[in-house]
Regions:
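Structural motif
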Residues: 87-91, 145-149, 173-176, 199, ...
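Non-catalytic signal-transmission and effector/linker regions of two-component phosphorelay proteins
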Residues: 10-16, 28-122, 159, 187-194, ...
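Alpha4 helix (beta4-alpha4-beta5 surface) of REC/receiver domains from two-component response regulators
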Residues: 152-156, 160-164, 172-196, 202-206, ...
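Conserved phosphotransfer microenvironments
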Residues: 65-66, 95-98, 102, 107, ...
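Intrinsic-disorder-associated, low-complexity terminal segments enriched in Asp/Asn/His/Tyr and depleted
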Residues: 8-9, 21
Length: 411
């Protein structure tokens, strides 16, 4: 029997060939997997008829017919970043807009990700001005600020936003890593949603927007439609600022394929709402809470090895979190990453993928793992010796492959 586990936007399943009949078999008992397959993808009848264990899923939510599914899709992602208040010096704003081609990038990525709307950006050159504008104009969904602009820093701005009763996420975008570390060490950051590091590309702003949207929408979307979740655990600002844009870029590529498979334009629009959510955590307690809360929906974990646990850096935090994930959902792929290569044998012996942080090919290696193990790539049929016998890029090709993959393989 040849099997390959994959995730895509459908949840984790395995494709198998047995006695000449190629079928998709749910690879774990989680009801969210069956819900994902049965409600998120509008699978063609020709394929549904050959998917075992999916057409009559056992889920706590009511089974929806096609029109109800369509309406449910439209109700996903209730929180959207439509208007961004950018707080930066005129020079920093110029860099962000010109060198990063911010407006062009926002247009391009917004069209690819949801086809609905492009965030508007309003620029102000002081935190005090931003606070007054946010108070007087409730349209802003996100405030992105430098470490300090004018006579107020980002921590003070976030604090005053909360005191004013404004439910607006405040994200800090810094340009110098040393300044960021000093800022975090000297200022309370409890009112700040997240701190990011600019690394030369405006793609980080897209990652910030999607991070905020995912954080706000994940509870609603998982409950409503079983939308899958990717958990990222990293406390180093430099690293998560680097690889979050990479992960979202891979999601964008996969989303393009999903768009092409829509029944019509309206269906293509709403299906984009069901893209996987990415949750970012920076300490063990928060990560463990997310694992417990979304255990039915997590389809993969990318985690640092050493991060805060009970207030102190612990070299066991990543391994303990991975053990927890596997105890709840044994087939979920887990990637552990660290600059300490002595952890590689232990990680691989326990069945986890390993990435070396300081490797010059880190981002390339991450893309490869996302494609090969997290199902961001094609659906690949393989023989027991791992030889490839077929590949499907979308549901249409998958339906065709069901007729052509060779029979006679033994379990």
């Amino acid at each position: 029997m040849a099997c390959r586990t994959f995730s895509h936007h459908f949840g984790r399943v395995s494709g198998c060939q047995l006695q000449g009949d190629v079928f998709l078999n749910v690879s774990r008992k989680s009801s969210s997997v069956q819900r994902a397959l049965s409600t998120l993808t509008f699978l063609p009848p020709a394929i549904c008829s050959r998917i075992r264990g999916v057409t009559v899923p056992t889920i706590s939510a009511p089974i929806l017919d096609i029109e109800e599914r369509f309406e449910a899709f439209e109700n996903l992602m209730p929180f959207r970043v439509q208007n961004i208040l950018l707080v930066s010096s005129l020079y920093d704003s110029f860099i962000l807009r010109e060198d990063g081609r911010l407006n062009e990038l926002l247009i391009d990525e917004s069209l690819e990700m949801n086809l609905r709307q492009i965030p508007n950006i309003t620029h102000v050159s002081s935190c005090a001005e931003a606070l007054e504008l946010a108070k007087s104009n409730p349209q802003f969904n996100l405030i992105v600020t430098n470490l300090a602009v004018g006579d107020m820093n980002a921590a003070q701005l976030a604090r005053d936003v909360r005191r004013a009763g404004l439910d607006v996420p405040v994200v800090v975008l810094g340009y110098d890593y040393r300044e960021i570390k000093d800022f975090v060490a000297r200022n309370p950051t409890t009112d700040i949603d997240r701190v990011f590091l600019w690394q030369g590309t405006a793609r980080i702003l897209i990652a910030i927007v999607k991070y905020v949207e995912d954080k706000r929408n994940v509870l609603h979307d998982t409950r409503a439609m079983g939308v899958p979740v990717l958990l990222v655990v990293e406390d180093n600002i430099r690293y998560y600022s680097s690889f979050l844009p990479v992960i979202y870029t891979e999601l964008i590529k996969q989303s393009r394929r999903v768009i092409q498979e829509g029944i019509n334009v309206a269906h293509k629009l709403v299906r984009m709402q069901a893209r996987p959510k990415i949750l970012l955590s920076s300490n063990f307690e928060e990560a463990a809470e997310l694992v417990q809360q979304y255990r039915e929906y997590i389809f993969g974990v990318v985690s640092d090895v050493e991060f805060p646990w009970e207030g102190k850096l612990s070299p066991e935090a990543g391994f303990e979190l991975a053990r927890m994930v596997r105890s709840l959902t044994p087939d979920v792929p887990v990637v552990l990453q660290t600059s300490r290569t002595e952890f590689r044998p232990r990680a691989q012996a326990q069945g986890y993928s390993f990435l070396r942080k300081r490797s010059p090919t880190l981002l390339k290696d991450l893309r490869r793992i996302l494609t090969d193990q997290f199902g961001f790539g094609d659906f690949v049929f393989r023989m027991p010796d791992q030889g490839e016998v077929g590949r499907a890029k979308d549901l249409t090709e998958l339906e065709e492959m069901l007729q052509t993959v060779p029979a006679g393989m033994k379990a």
